[in-house]
Amino acid sequence: VGSEMCIRDRPFIVANHPAAALLLKTGALGLSASQAIAASVSAPDWTQLWVPTPHPSIILLYYILLFSIATQPIISRPLLLKIVGLAAAVGMLLHPFRLSILLGQPPTTVTILNVGHGSANLVEFTNGRVVLIDGGARSAPGYDCGERIIAPYLWHRGIGKIDDIIITHDDTDHYNGIFTLLTRFKPERLWLPHLDENKPAFTRLVDRARRQGITIITPAAGEIIAGDDEQMSVLGDHRAAGLTSEDDRGLVVRLTSGGKSVLFPGDITTRRELELVAVRTQVRSTILLSPHHGSATSNSPALLSAVSPEWLIISSGTS
């Protein structure tokens, strides 16, 4: 059955035949198979490689080495070029930027990243261990602070792997950037205050970590996360039966190193603050990350007096 049309005064026959539908469906099978093959090939981790940004001087040494290799056939003194190339190669291997990692003993550094209203704190220990405490931000849908802020900073620092990620609290502004970091930095351990199956996004994060073989740890009160000369420990009992607020059931982490200390209290409220002070928990710290992003329901005078910080940092955006 057909119908006749006229295009630019010329007759044109449009066929409506069962064979046409069969041909279209046959072609669609090929397209679907191609899409499935492309998806399966691109899915594994080995199809993409994420690396930290090399130091500018390493890039310079690389080009010197490349130049020495490429110009040997046309230079009258190839021995000199070989020496220059060898020196460049040795310089790349023993670059001060790499020596600080190989020899150890750089000072422990703590970086509070500006993610707006959220929390992302990087700790680099003297032994090379890298710990991220929280990694999230209150942001528009589709914006990933892990991909846009945290990962670029880590690459800028020359960090290609995170050893531990600690999530102090299961609000999204503490962890929604960590999905990306699990894939790109492959941490060995993920520390959580608890496993809350009532929060789908949080559950998806935990499930992804398990699929990647990451060890899931829910630490007890007083548990030591890092030891030796530097110590990172969990303060207070975040599992106490009387704690009904989700904010108060988060982790409070204290880092001490070289006579200095930093307190990461998550989103705890005044009630949990007073309990920490009442049992004489060692909370005195050089730096205090303001509880709950500086909220009026936290930051009690009792806690501020007990911590007595030299610096108070509020990780919050404009409202």
List each language-model region with its residue ranges:
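Non-globular, low-confidence helical/coil segments that flank catalytic cores
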Residues: 4, 9-319
